[in-house]
């Protein structure tokens, strides 16, 4: 029997006149993800059939699981429109795909309106031919454990059992570009993933304070980027490493203890906005969730984002921590994020961080040191890596800080 994968689109059905553009982008992204697998495609309106060798089945499903814009997919089998042929294929599919005993229902969709039988009649006829062959099948119309779907179309009949959930959302490439302020923690990788799922093409922006912080903290971010790269159409993602050490030292030296995190994050936002504007990125993205820490109260968020005018997206802003953790486990970043290596946000935590900062006091704290030249110097020395899922780079083996390590690595 002829086997393929049926791909169904997700939120694309909502896009009206823009729908062809979105479908074109998702076709492009699917082709890119499956370029190393021997497959063929059949494109029909709002669905895609992927034809493949059985030996590649697991790899095809794995790669499709990384493509945003797909709502679900199913293993699907094709035959003619002859009732006897449909019933015979249904038996073979049940033997192959269904675990018995189970309650059972056949649902038919008939798009070929010239076919002599109506949808319900097709279901009844096929059921009468199939059920005698299986002792473990019991008809249950209202709430069956198993549904056998029959789609009778002009070119033939398709049969499948069940749907494999996919990412949903929109295809990357049509939603603009964003700069993710990526720490080594749990939240920001999830924020990056959620934005990618919604079609945003992201780059990663990490503030590193080596040697104040260990190189292992940067290694964490590299490993997280490798996981996120799976969800891009071309299996690669840009990671920008921003040298924050001098700014960090100045903040620790001059800023009052309760305001250290507030001022540090204001510097993050300034750097992110300048870099985004210089490189054609439309928005900043972060992993802030209201009230989780002192710097994420509404008062703190208001004061911190006061230094920017660029849009700031916070996809996990209302998520519970457990919800964020569950997503991080699903995208395989959780075990990396909890590794015990401090970054610049966690290396020094004030005893009593301010939870209701004011803009006036923040400006007063910033007036204690000259930070503009420090920001300019940091931006001039950003180190950019192109990360893929197979990037093999142990940063601690190449130097004592990021600049030395990357310089040594590129010379090898």
Swiss-Prot record:
Ranked from the top, the taxonomy reads: Bacteria, Bacillati, Mycoplasmatota, Mollicutes, Acholeplasmatales
Q: Which organism is it from?
A: Acholeplasma laidlawii (strain PG-8A)
Q: Which GO terms describe its biological process?
A: thiamine biosynthetic process; thiamine diphosphate biosynthetic process; thiazole biosynthetic process; tRNA 4-thiouridine biosynthesis
Reactions catalysed according to its record: [ThiI sulfur-carrier protein]-S-sulfanyl-L-cysteine + a uridine in tRNA + 2 reduced [2Fe-2S]-[ferredoxin] + ATP + H(+) = [ThiI sulfur-carrier protein]-L-cysteine + a 4-thiouridine in tRNA + 2 oxidized [2Fe-2S]-[ferredoxin] + AMP + diphosphate; [ThiS sulfur-carrier protein]-C-terminal Gly-Gly-AMP + S-sulfanyl-L-cysteinyl-[cysteine desulfurase] + AH2 = [ThiS sulfur-carrier protein]-C-terminal-Gly-aminoethanethioate + L-cysteinyl-[cysteine desulfurase] + A + AMP + 2 H(+)
Query: What is the official name of this protein in its record?
Result: Probable tRNA sulfurtransferase
| UniProt-listed NCBIfam families | tRNA uracil 4-sulfurtransferase ThiI
- Please tell me one Gene Ontology term that the record gives under cellular component: cytosol
Principal EC category: transferase
User: Where is it mainly found?
Assistant: cytoplasm
């Amino acid at each position: 029997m002829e086997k393929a994968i049926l791909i169904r689109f997700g939120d694309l059905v909502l896009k009206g006149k823009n729908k062809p553009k979105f479908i074109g982008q998702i076709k492009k992204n699917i082709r890119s993800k499956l370029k190393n697998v021997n497959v063929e495609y059949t494109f029909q309106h709002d669905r895609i059939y992927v034809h493949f060798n059985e030996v590649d089945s697991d790899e095809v499903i794995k790669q499709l699981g990384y493509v945003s814009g797909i709502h679900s997919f199913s293993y699907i089998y094709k035959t003619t429109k002859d009732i006897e042929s449909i019933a015979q294929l249904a038996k073979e599919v049940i033997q192959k795909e269904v675990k018995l005993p189970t309650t059972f229902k056949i649902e038919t969709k008939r798009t070929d309106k010239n076919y002599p039988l109506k949808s319900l009649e097709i279901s009844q006829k096929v059921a009468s031919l199939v059920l005698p062959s299986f002792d473990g099948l019991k008809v249950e119309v209202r709430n069956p454990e198993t549904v056998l779907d029959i789609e009778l179309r002009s070119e033939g009949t398709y049969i499948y059992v069940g749907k494999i959930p996919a990412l949903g959302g929109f295809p990357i490439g049509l939603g603009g570009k964003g700069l993710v302020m990526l720490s080594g923690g749990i939240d920001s990788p999830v924020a990056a993933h959620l934005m990618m799922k919604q079609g945003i093409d992201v780059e990663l922006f990490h503030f590193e304070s080596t040697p104040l912080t260990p190189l292992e903290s940067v290694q964490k971010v590299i490993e997280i980027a490798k996981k996120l790269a799976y969800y891009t159409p071309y299996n690669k993602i840009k990671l920008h490493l921003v040298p924050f050490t001098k700014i960090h030292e100045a903040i620790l030296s001059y800023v009052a203890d309760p305001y250290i995190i507030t001022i540090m994050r204001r510097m993050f936002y300034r750097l992110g906005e300048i870099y985004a504007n210089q490189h054609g990125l439309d928005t900043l993205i972060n992993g802030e969730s209201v009230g989780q820490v002192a710097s994420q109260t509404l008062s703190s968020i208001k004061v911190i984002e006061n230094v920017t005018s660029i849009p700031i997206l916070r996809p996990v802003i209302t998520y519970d921590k457990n919800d964020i953790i569950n997503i991080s486990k699903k995208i395989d970043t959780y075990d990396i994020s909890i590794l015990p290596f401090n970054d610049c946000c966690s290396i020094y935590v004030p005893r009593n961080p301010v939870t209701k900062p004011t803009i006036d006091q923040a400006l007063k704290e910033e007036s204690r040191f000259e930070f503009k030249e420090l920001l300019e110097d940091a931006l001039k020395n950003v180190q950019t890596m192109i990360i893929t899922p197979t990037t093999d780079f142990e940063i601690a083996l190449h130097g004592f800080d990021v600049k030395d390590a990357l310089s040594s690595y590129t010379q090898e």
